[in-house]
Amino acid sequence: MKLHELQPAPGSRKERTRVGRGIGSGKGKTSGRGQKGQNARSGGGVRLGFEGGQTPLFRRLPKRGFTNINRKEYAIVNLDKLNRFEDGTEVTPELLLETGVISKLKSGVKILGKGQIEKKLTVKAHKFSASAKEAIEAAGGKTEVI
């Protein structure tokens, strides 16, 4: 067998149906669109969420809540991600961004307590969870809120 002799498995490739090419094809005349109506027209079809004139679901349900324009979203870093740094390293948001631990700074960095930390690090972040702070200090490191 050579590369130019390769063929797809039988039945794995299907030829596309050419519609509107005579009644003998089985998809002629109306081309599978049925008779008249909105869906038979060019560009026809109903918009997303349209339920045939019945009040759509999104209008039957009540409005709820609002978007807080002052919301702060923190980039989240779990403890186990900090093990990649050497002992005694000062871990800053800039360093986390540089090393690819976080992709965006957002409103700051929050350290969460998932996983174990074995290194003695000085961690500077905008927020710490109680369990993260406890674990870093138990490993001999320091935490600093910036």
Curated annotation (Swiss-Prot):
<keyword id="KW-0699">rRNA-binding</keyword>
<keyword id="KW-0694">RNA-binding</keyword>
<dbReference type="InterPro" id="IPR005749">
    <property type="entry name" value="Ribosomal_uL15_bac-type"/>
</dbReference>
<feature type="compositionally biased region" description="Gly residues">
    <location>
        <begin position="42"/>
        <end position="52"/>
    </location>
</feature>
<keyword id="KW-0689">Ribosomal protein</keyword>
<comment type="subunit">
    <text>Part of the 50S ribosomal subunit.</text>
</comment>
<dbReference type="GO" id="GO:0006412">
    <property type="term" value="P:translation"/>
</dbReference>
<keyword id="KW-0687">Ribonucleoprotein</keyword>
<dbReference type="InterPro" id="IPR036227">
    <property type="entry name" value="Ribosomal_uL15/eL18_sf"/>
</dbReference>
<dbReference type="InterPro" id="IPR001196">
    <property type="entry name" value="Ribosomal_uL15_CS"/>
</dbReference>
<dbReference type="GO" id="GO:0003735">
    <property type="term" value="F:structural constituent of ribosome"/>
</dbReference>
<dbReference type="GO" id="GO:0019843">
    <property type="term" value="F:rRNA binding"/>
</dbReference>
<feature type="region of interest" description="Disordered">
    <location>
        <begin position="1"/>
        <end position="53"/>
    </location>
</feature>
<dbReference type="GO" id="GO:0022625">
    <property type="term" value="C:cytosolic large ribosomal subunit"/>
</dbReference>
<dbReference type="InterPro" id="IPR030878">
    <property type="entry name" value="Ribosomal_uL15"/>
</dbReference>
<feature type="compositionally biased region" description="Gly residues">
    <location>
        <begin position="21"/>
        <end position="35"/>
    </location>
</feature>
<dbReference type="Pfam" id="PF00828">
    <property type="entry name" value="Ribosomal_L27A"/>
</dbReference>
<comment type="similarity">
    <text>Belongs to the universal ribosomal protein uL15 family.</text>
</comment>
<dbReference type="InterPro" id="IPR021131">
    <property type="entry name" value="Ribosomal_uL15/eL18"/>
</dbReference>
<protein>
    <recommendedName>
        <fullName>Large ribosomal subunit protein uL15</fullName>
    </recommendedName>
</protein>
<comment type="function">
    <text>Binds to the 23S rRNA.</text>
</comment>
